Amino acid sequence: MQRAALLLLLILLAFSPTPGLRAQGTFQQDTLPTGSGDLTITFIGHGTLMFSHGETVVHVDPVSREADYTHLPDADLILVTHEHGDHLDPEAIALLQKDDTRVVASPSCEGRIEGVRIMENGEEADLSGFHVEAVPAYNRVHMRSEGTPYHPQGNGNGYIITFEDLRVYVAGDTENIPEMKALQDIDVAFLPMNLPYTMTPEMVADAARAFRPRILYPYHFGDTDPSRLVDLLGNEPEIEVRVREMG
């Protein structure tokens, strides 16, 4: 009898979701209007996001440690910012792929995913009904102990995705680099804010004042207190800082 009970318990555990992982319906979401229907943003966690526009779904940096992807919608488009394990997860990508899913990644991901399109900094393409721009993402200030940047120039991408008339910038792992500060006509921005890999709240505020997104979401912020960023931009009424749970 005890052996049968133990066997039943092992079977239940084998088919149970990994502790801590969440499925659709448990994440925070925002809905923004576009010229052709609403854009729904799902805040998965850390640097991982999902965008839904009509029937089309875009996943950015899907990683299995942030979600149970067997319970999330399949992807029409997957964007990967760089090769680090908290951004690139081939198993999560495989779970989300359909026959016609497009997978786009930065140069540092080449050879790590099958069937991927590599986009260099500065490239643009129309993918799955959206215009996508790959923009630089790198460190200039924060370095490893041997003096090399955590994210070297040219390895990683940020992405600007145009959903009809709404331009959404997902910065990836980067600092407040000149290319970021020169961006124009950004409606929604996701800027990373954790040390030593990306930016301080002061660096994020500096970048936001330069390119002036209408809505700014800090993400990838780890243990950094996002209220500091809210305070820094408190005198910028045209930039709405929205803090969401990112796991």
Regions found by a protein language model. Give the residues of each.
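Sec/Tat signal peptide C-region and signal peptidase I cleavage site
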Residues: 18-22
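Bacterial N-terminal signal peptides
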Residues: 5-17
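Active-site environment of divalent metal-dependent phosphoester hydrolases
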Residues: 66-68, 84-88, 110-112, 123-126, ...
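Binuclear metal-ion centers of metallo-dependent hydrolases, dominated by the metallo-beta-lactamase
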Residues: 117-128, 153, 205, 209-247
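Proline-aspartate-enriched helix->loop->beta-strand connector
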Residues: 186-191, 195-218
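Active-site metal-binding motif and surrounding structural segment of the metallo-beta-lactamase
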Residues: 64-111, 184-190
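A short acidic, amphipathic alpha-helical/loop segment
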Residues: 91-96, 179-182, 203-207, 228-232
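Core dinuclear metal-dependent hydrolase active-site scaffold
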Residues: 24-73, 115-184, 245-247
